[in-house]
Amino acid sequence: LHLCDRRQRQMCIRDSRKYFRINKEGYRQPGVFEYRLITQSKKEYSYGIAISYAAKEIISEWLVRIEKNGSETCIFNRDIDESGENFTFSEVTHKNEAEKIKWEIFLDVFGKNISPAMKKKSILSDVAERSNEKSGVLKEIMDVYEWFQSIIILFPTSQYSGLNQLVEKEEVRKFFSGILKYFDTGIESVESKQGEMNFDRIFEGIPKEHAEKLKIRISNDIENDPVMFKVNNQVYSLRKDEEGNIITTKMMQNHGNPQELFEYSDESDGTQRLFDLIPLFYEHQNNRVIFIDEIDRSLHTNLTRRFLELFYSLTEKSDCQIIATTHDSNLLDLDLVRQDEIWFIKRLEDHSSKMYSLNRYKERYDKKIDKEYLLGRYDAIPIFDEEILEDMND
């Protein structure tokens, strides 16, 4: 399942090879994903979707509202009948007749359009494209869709788009400068350098065919908003001035000599990683869920810990949440995170993975979790087979 560009307002199947490929029959088994979430309206939902990897289509989709007393109210439940040619929907309770009619009209259009493309499309994205209702079932579906669209995902090599504000807004640069100085990076301040766009110079070293595609895409995207992109390990922000000229703004760093500024590409991998992470401090007011893969990548262990402590202090009164993977065992500290917030991933004999919480071990709160983990108490550590080395030496 892929969250497409927000302007396209789509959730669709992009890659059908994400099944468990070690099992030869894995592609025949459906992939089932279910989420428990709280929307901006403070309502709790369970949204689920089942996809067929073989047919490359959605075979089931459902949305349930979780009431405060723990009871469940079905918002919709979509399935495909035995023939595979028709959608079926469960009965839904509506507050009034007007809302019921609107929902039936939506289902009538959705159900009649059971094309191959529609089988790949979620109800969430279809409602987002065709409805602007402010109440009722359609509004609830839209709220859940917006929750998915608000998710921030940072992979080790990804570039968070919040950096666009850094090169465009002075107050953001001041904030960045303070945080970078606090983390002892050697950077005194973050500056910006403007000039007219020179595509040939910026795209130097990139194959001409790819460079031309980038030029076209940037020129189209820049019509509405500033565009940020990264090329040759340098970050640029582009916008059009009043005369239609494309202006580029480049991020620069002052390491103590304002006359000799450093480019983004001059910084260490750890400092560049901080540029990806610091914009997250702005998101605590938006109640977003933030996924970070390898949060500790290229960072000193003390810095990673302090980053999390700062984030926790900012989000104490909000519903913002970080879900991160790490190999830094020093973060396994019950003074930093709760037992139910620590999860391990263990590879099983069939090469599948199993997730389980530290909470199952019911450890004392003064336990040194990092030491116990490295000793193998919780599994989820590499096991070195010395016999393999012996066989290689024979």
Mark where each language-model region is.
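Glycine-centered tight beta-turn/hairpin loop motif at sheet-sheet or coil-to-beta transitions
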Residues: 40-44, 256-259
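Short beta-strand segments that buttress and anchor functional surface loops
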Residues: 33-39, 63, 252-253
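Electropositive, glycine-dotted interaction segments
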Residues: 46-213
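Single conserved hydrophobic/aromatic residue that forms the stacking wall/gate
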Residues: 1-9, 13
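Short, hydrophobic/aromatic-rich segments at coil-to-beta transitions
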Residues: 27-36, 57-60
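Flexible phosphate/Mg2+-sensing switch loops adjacent to catalytic phosphate-binding sites
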Residues: 14-26, 335-336
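Switch/communication elements of ASCE P-loop NTPase nucleotide-binding domains
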Residues: 7-10, 248-388, 392-394
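Conserved NTPase motor "head" modules and their coupling/switch loops across ABC/AAA+ ATPases, GTPases
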Residues: 147-289, 360
